Amino acid sequence: MIICVVGMPGSGKGQIVRIFGKYGIPHVSMGDIVREEADRRGVPRTPEGMNSVSIQLRQELGDNAVAKLAIPKVRELLKTHEAVIIEGVRSLDEIQAFKDAFPEEKVIIIAVHSSPQKRFERLSKRGRSDDPKSWSEFEARDWKELKFGLGNVIALADYLIVNESHLTQYRRKIERLAERLGIKKKYFTF
């Protein structure tokens, strides 16, 4: 099973990855792939740099470029795991790339939604170098994400989790979804 976790920046995708990791499910981060590629190309990890690398990759390899780079990692993990989480898919082209590469696997999309204000607060605290430093940078990043097609993936998600509440409540929602997906608890402790 391939579980694609999608959502706008700061929506809470990473928390799903952490909780499913406690169930023994590994993950591949699409954002990490772009950051690694930026490092390889000598591009700074700023919002502008990350956007530039994302666009360059798509120009060079097609709209599913980041998925193409992720597929070997996913393939390797599926050799030893029943499921893999892919965090940060941005387009239906990327979803289709995973379906084409792994026709024997069920591909599930989980979308996470949080209000812009909540997401901005989270990103302001996160402190990653490519996080927006102002509300205008935040809005610009949202528009760039939507131009990649992220809204279409969210709209066609199999499951939607709203993350506006306390972390404990959000974790419970994630746990219930894992149970619905038939994922067995392995290392589940907090």
Swiss-Prot record:
> Which residues take part in binding ATP?
7-14
* UniProt KW Hydrolase keyword: no
Pfam families, per the entry: AAA_17
Question: GO molecular function, one example?
Answer: ATP binding
Kindly give the InterPro entries that the UniProt entry links to this protein: NTP_hydrolase-rel, P-loop_NTPase
- Which key words are in the record? ATP-binding, Nucleotide-binding
- Entry similarity comment: Belongs to the UPF0200 family.
Q: Which HAMAP family match?
A: UPF0200
What is the protein named? UPF0200 protein TSIB_0920
Organism, by scientific name, is Thermococcus sibiricus (strain DSM 12597 / MM 739)
Its lineage reads: Archaea, Methanobacteriati, Methanobacteriota, Thermococci, Thermococcales
